[in-house]
Swiss-Prot record:
GO terms for cellular component: extracellular region. Glycans are attached at P77. It comes from Medicago truncatula (Barrel medic). This is CLAVATA3/ESR (CLE)-related protein 53. Residues 1-26 form the signal peptide. The lineage of its organism: Eukaryota, Viridiplantae, Streptophyta, Embryophyta, Tracheophyta. Belongs to the CLV3/ESR signal peptide family.
Length: 82
């Protein structure tokens, strides 16, 4: 009887352990070892740096012009034109 109980407990332990390992691999491994995610994060970071540089250049040009916009919008439609 003791041998049957021990083997049954061992079998249940192995099943539970297997389920835990499969569950943890499904969640943790893609996050830890995904090179695609790292590449996407590096591209996003590079894009943010480029946008910051562009914005700083635009702000510098605008400050040099005294805060005036570079282009002037037209006054509107011509009254003589239909």
């Amino acid at each position: 009887m003791a041998t049957s109980t021990n083997s049954r407990e061992f079998l249940i332990f192995i099943c539970v352990l297997t389920l835990l390992v499969v569950r943890s691999e499904a969640r943790l491994v893609p996050m830890l070892f995904s090179t695609k995610e790292k590449v996407m994060n590096s591209k996003f970071g590079l894009r943010e740096v480029i946008n910051d540089v562009r914005n700083s250049e635009w702000l510098r040009k605008r400050a040099l012009l005294g805060g005036k916009p570079e282009r002037v919008s037209p006054g509107g439609p011509d009254a003589q034109h239909h």
